[in-house]
UniProtKB/Swiss-Prot annotation:
GO MF entries: phosphatidylglycerol-prolipoprotein diacylglyceryl transferase activity
GO biological process: lipoprotein biosynthetic process
Pfam families, per database record: LGT
Family as reported in the entry's similarity comment: Belongs to the Lgt family.
Keyword Transmembrane helix found: yes
Subcellular location: Cell inner membrane
Source taxon at top rank: Bacteria
Source organism (scientific name): Nitratidesulfovibrio vulgaris (strain DSM 19637 / Miyazaki F)
Record pathway: Protein modification; lipoprotein biosynthesis (diacylglyceryl transfer)
Gene Ontology CC, one term: plasma membrane
Protein name: Phosphatidylglycerol--prolipoprotein diacylglyceryl transferase
Keywords tagged on the record: Cell inner membrane, Cell membrane, Membrane, Transferase, Transmembrane, Transmembrane helix
Length: 265
């Protein structure tokens, strides 16, 4: 068994101000996505300018924060937030949903594409490879917060989390950081480096994320207010991954054999 590091959730305190690791991880994710976007935009034939990346990332940030928070409230704990509306704004304590954040980003990208007169799916293809680093940092934030731990296990790398009871558990946050952050980034970044049919990069992102998240949910403790939804193992996270997988497969297969569009557009 490994010792849980017990990192103070507060990274820096300046008088009454507290800067928490969870919030800083989101900041690191936004910065990494912005930097990667500018790097991709600088490549010949990308069809993007750095200023356009700045504008698009700004729209996406609002989509992530608003969509992620609203998604968590609606999908995971509506009853609690209906009774404690002030808690809606306490984002630093956690409570963000990837699927809600994804919907928020898609809506923000749609608004940006409409304003910039760009094809929606082409913009999503450009954005998709920029997302996994943010997922990596977000899961590290979950780990530092000691939340979203895994199910009990006897594996040698199990950890006892501060609020997870006396049982050693899967560090499922780290599993997700590796799969959804590192592996997903490597696959989608490589795939998007060549010309692909419009929507194919977005499709690969959706399919791989759904597979990785669905798999990790088997060793992740479900949210206590929801538990398992069916069959003694099906979680809300897995349910939300099903349409993502379906849409991703459709995007991958719909233009199979079609002419490839501009890379990273």
């Amino acid at each position: 068994m490994l010792a849980y590091p017990r990192i103070d959730p507060v990274a820096v305190s300046i008088g009454p101000l507290q800067f928490r690791w969870y919030g800083l991880m989101y900041l690191f994710g936004f910065i990494s996505g912005w930097w990667l976007g500018r790097r991709r935009a600088a490549q010949p034939g990308s069809g993007w300018h750095p200023q356009q990346v700045d504008d698009m990332v700004t729209w996406a940030i609002f989509g992530v924060v608003l969509g992620g928070r609203l998604g968590y409230i609606l999908f995971y704990d509506l009853a609690y937030y209906a009774s404690q509306p002030a808690a809606i704004f306490q984002i630093w304590h956690g409570g963000m949903s990837f699927h809600g954040g994804l919907l928020g980003v898609l809506f923000a990208v749609w608004l940006y594409a409409r304003r910039a007169e760009r094809e929606f799916l082409s913009v999503v293809d450009f954005v998709a490879p920029l997302i996994p680093p943010g997922l990596f940092f977000g899961r590290i934030g979950n780990f530092i917060n000691g939340e979203l731990w895994g199910a009990p296990t006897t594996l040698p790398w199990a950890m006892v989390f501060p609020d997870g009871g006396p049982f050693p558990r899967h560090p499922s946050q780290l599993y997700e950081a590796v799969l959804e952050g590192v592996v997903l980034f490597a696959a989608v970044w490589w795939f998007s480096g060549r010309k692909r049919p419009v929507g194919a990069v977005s499709g690969l992102f959706g399919v791989l994320y759904a597979i990785f998240r669905f798999a990790v949910e088997f060793v992740r403790e479900p949210d206590p207010q929801l538990g398992y939804l069916a069959f003694g193992w099906l979680t809300m996270g897995q349910v939300l991954c099903l349409p993502l997988f379906g849409v991703g497969m459709w995007l991958l297969l719909r233009n199979r054999g079609a002419a490839e569009g501009p890379a990273a557009r």
